[in-house]
From Swiss-Prot:
It is found in: Cell inner membrane. This is Lipoprotein-releasing system ATP-binding protein LolD. Belongs to the ABC transporter superfamily. Lipoprotein translocase (TC 3.A.1.125) family. ATP binds at G42, E43, S44, G45, S46, G47, K48, S49. The complex is composed of two ATP-binding proteins (LolD) and two transmembrane proteins (LolC and LolE). Keywords: ATP-binding, Cell inner membrane, Cell membrane, Membrane, Nucleotide-binding, Translocase, Transport. It is a peripheral membrane protein. Its main location: membrane. The lineage of its organism: Bacteria, Pseudomonadati, Spirochaetota, Spirochaetia, Spirochaetales. Part of the ABC transporter complex LolCDE involved in the translocation of mature outer membrane-directed lipoproteins, from the inner membrane to the periplasmic chaperone, LolA. Responsible for the formation of the LolA-lipoprotein complex in an ATP-dependent manner. SUPFAM superfamilies: P-loop containing nucleoside triphosphate hydrolases. Its EC number is 7.6.2.-. One of its GO terms (molecular function) is ATP binding. CDD domains: ABC_MJ0796_LolCDE_FtsE. It comes from Treponema denticola (strain ATCC 35405 / DSM 14222 / CIP 103919 / JCM 8153 / KCTC 15104).
Amino acid sequence: MSKDIVLISGLTKTFSSASEKLVIFDKLNFSIEEGKKISITGESGSGKSTFLNILGGLESADSGEIIAGSYKVHSLDEKSLTEYRSSFLGLVFQFHYLLKDFTALENVMLPALIAGRSKKEIKEKALSLLEDVKLAERKNHFPSQLSGGERQRVAVARSLINSPSLILADEPTGNLDPANAETVQNLLFSVVDKHKKTLVLVTHDQNIASMTDISYKLYKGNLEEV
């Protein structure tokens, strides 16, 4: 029997300036089924990245409840938020955020080391994840020695090192040329399926969105299935 990994109730988010008040979400109700790959499209400024930031505990909503797994994200203190981000979530952004003085392998291992796991314990898993994204032979290369697509593939591998339940990906191929974008996107879907993770993908590319299990369009504060 399927179950929901994320439940959102009454989510409200606004931005205010001196001249106007912009409503991003107005009492949004939404759920995400465990094990599904979903995509969110929408116009620039519609709130796609804001949605991911709120779900990821990187930004606060004005009101509403967000339950992700056993975490009540809307009411977590900073210590619990850190635990939520490091253990429950895997994050992939448009920019790779790799440390330039760390090799590909070391960059993949880093989140687990920060979480207090031993280097010996995680090295084998990090190598396996690099194999998943077809970069095992470049494990000792530094970011400057990798192409843009390869750097983003390292970021995909890194997102899985702490065995998260939910992967949040914000335009992960947005800075890549079409050929590299296709490679990275296919590998992201492949590793998500292999490791049985749930994926929430923000993209402007309708072709990529059509490859997910369910695609939603964010329009006027509502997520509508397309």
